């Protein structure tokens, strides 16, 4: 059956700021306390979405979350009106204010793990929300992510959206950023590659930075998504590269159809994994980048592998890269060699995503891949699909509500909270989502 990969990109939120909240993510840490530009960040993301849609790649948008998220501050013991809560936390514990104001939901590669209908036992598209429990600020996302996905994939005959796994370390799940699918045409059954960093009873794990994904979580997600057991491979990421800042597998590898583009040191027991994939995926091709040409450090700093590998109708592929790759002589030299070599990659497309990159999120972080048949695509909430009208409406919305300068101190401004809620209220109407945000259901959360 014919099917297409639709990229659902996260729209950057109004409180996008640099707080260094993500230990193990070196870009996040080294840009801590810099001044951010939320308006520019949102527009950079929108330009990528529109350019890819115009190039013929189906594209949709996932909206930001409510931030600052007052209900969690109340759970932490801050009381009074919303304004009083903001004032108290800013004065007594500003780190909590930064955490509950993070715009990290923009990186929707961590929103959920997807199983296309061609791979599932019941013939539905399955989406399991990620619990993201390794980082406090990201653990706050799951409930609203579930509401948003249910509003977008609202046809229960075709889509099953599963709640996140229990919030315990044993079941740490980071979503599609640790998941690849390999195979032929999108509508054919594919091989799902779940990548984990640690498992109970296995001493092979990183020592410097945390391994966020567990094998136990990956196995549970595969069960929830009803993936045919014959179409699943579990593989461990190389713990040494996690310790070098590869906090998700999509920082060191990306797949599309029959191609796996990865670093030579991406996986533990890599040669064994690639042999397994060759045996189980027709036409499988591994493009392994040697460490002698691109070091892990350079891969992390440029986000070479946090790229999008997209298929054209003629079978050729386009690699979507952040501008940092073009600015690094060694990486750009390798990429031009790659273009000249015998492989399906025939075009490089470069985007300026500096605002997201400075927090450790490249092109692949910003998108959630969902393979859909034509019938399934028609069943998706049409208001989220990118086109000229939506692009213009979202740009106008960003111009109206987003600031062009934001510091950690600005997060305590009650007007940022009020303006953000007004903006999301308008956006949820524009995207026909209904009442997906807690403030919409609870009358603003005062009291």
Curated annotation (Swiss-Prot):
Alphabetic keyword roster: Arginine metabolism, Hydrolase
Q: Where does substrate bind?
A: 19-28, 110, 137-138, 212, 250, 359
User: Which pathway features in its UniProt record?
Assistant: Amino-acid degradation; L-arginine degradation via AST pathway; L-glutamate and succinate from L-arginine: step 2/5
Its Enzyme Commission number(s) read 3.5.3.23
Entry's Gene Ontology molecular function annotations: N-succinylarginine dihydrolase activity
Superkingdom as given in the UniProt entry: Bacteria
Q: Which GO terms describe its biological process?
A: arginine catabolic process to glutamate; arginine catabolic process to succinate
What does UniProt list as catalytic? 174, 248, 365
Please write the reaction equations for the catalytic activity of this protein: N(2)-succinyl-L-arginine + 2 H2O + 2 H(+) = N(2)-succinyl-L-ornithine + 2 NH4(+) + CO2
Alphabetized InterPro entries for the sequence: AstB_sf, SuccinylArg_d-Hdrlase_AstB
The UniProt entry, under Pfam families, shows:
AstB (PF04996)
Q: Which HAMAP family match?
A: AstB
PANTHER family reported for this sequence? N-SUCCINYLARGININE DIHYDROLASE (PTHR30420:SF2)
Report the sequence similarity comment from the record: Belongs to the succinylarginine dihydrolase family.
**What subunit structure does UniProt give?**
Homodimer.
State the function annotated in the UniProt record. Catalyzes the hydrolysis of N(2)-succinylarginine into N(2)-succinylornithine, ammonia and CO(2).
The name this protein carries in UniProt is: N-succinylarginine dihydrolase
The organism that produces this protein has a lineage beginning with: Bacteria, Pseudomonadati, Pseudomonadota, Gammaproteobacteria, Enterobacterales
């Amino acid at each position: 059956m014919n099917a297409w990969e639709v990229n659902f990109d996260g729209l950057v939120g109004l409180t996008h700021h640099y707080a260094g909240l993500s230990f193990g993510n070196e870009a996040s840490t080294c840009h801590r306390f810099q001044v951010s530009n939320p308006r520019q960040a949102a527009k950079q993301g929108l330009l990528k979405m529109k350019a890819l849609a115009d190039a013929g790649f189906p594209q949709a948008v996932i909206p930001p979350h409510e931030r600052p998220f007052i209900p969690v501050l109340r759970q932490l013991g801050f009381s009074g009106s919303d304004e009083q809560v903001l004032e108290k936390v800013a004065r007594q514990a500003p780190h909590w204010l930064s955490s509950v104001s993070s715009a990290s939901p923009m990186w929707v590669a961590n929103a959920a793990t997807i199983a296309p209908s061609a791979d599932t036992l019941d013939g539905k598209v399955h989406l399991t929300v990620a619990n993201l429990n390794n980082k406090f600020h990201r653990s706050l996302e799951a409930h609203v992510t579930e509401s948003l996905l249910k509003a977008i994939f609202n046809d229960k005959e075709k889509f099953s959206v599963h709640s996140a796994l229990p919030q315990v370390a044993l079941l740490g799940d980071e979503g599609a950023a640790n998941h690849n699918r390999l195979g032929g045409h999108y509508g054919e059954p594919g091989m799902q590659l779940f990548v984990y960093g640690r498992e109970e009873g296995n001493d092979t794990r990183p020592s410097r930075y945390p391994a966020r994904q567990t094998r136990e979580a990956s196995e549970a997600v595969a069960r929830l998504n009803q993936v045919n057991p014959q179409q699943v491979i579990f593989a461990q990421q190389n713990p040494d590269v996690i310790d070098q800042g590869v906090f998700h597998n999509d920082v060191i590898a990306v797949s599309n159809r029959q191609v796996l583009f990865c670093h030579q040191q991406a996986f533990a027991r890599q040669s064994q994994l690639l042999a397994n994939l060759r045996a189980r995926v027709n036409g499988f091709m591994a493009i392994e980048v040697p460490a002698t040409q691109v070091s892990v450090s350079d891969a992390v700093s440029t986000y070479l592998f946090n790229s999008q590998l997209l298929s054209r109708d003629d079978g050729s592929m386009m690699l979507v890269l952040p501008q940092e790759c073009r600015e690094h002589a060694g990486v750009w030299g390798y990429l031009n060699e790659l273009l000249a070599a015998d492989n399906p990659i025939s075009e490089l497309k470069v985007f300026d995503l500096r605002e997201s990159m400075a927090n450790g999120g490249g092109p692949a972080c910003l998108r959630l891949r969902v393979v859909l048949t034509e019938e399934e695509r028609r069943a998706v909430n049409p208001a989220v699909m990118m086109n000229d009208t939506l692009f213009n409406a979202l740009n106008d919305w960003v111009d109206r509500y987003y600031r062009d300068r934001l510091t950690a101190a600005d997060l305590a401004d009650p007007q940022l909270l009020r303006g953000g809620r007004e903006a999301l209220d308008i956006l949820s109407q524009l995207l026909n989502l209904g009442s997906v945000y807690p403030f919409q259901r609870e009358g603003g959360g005062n009291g």
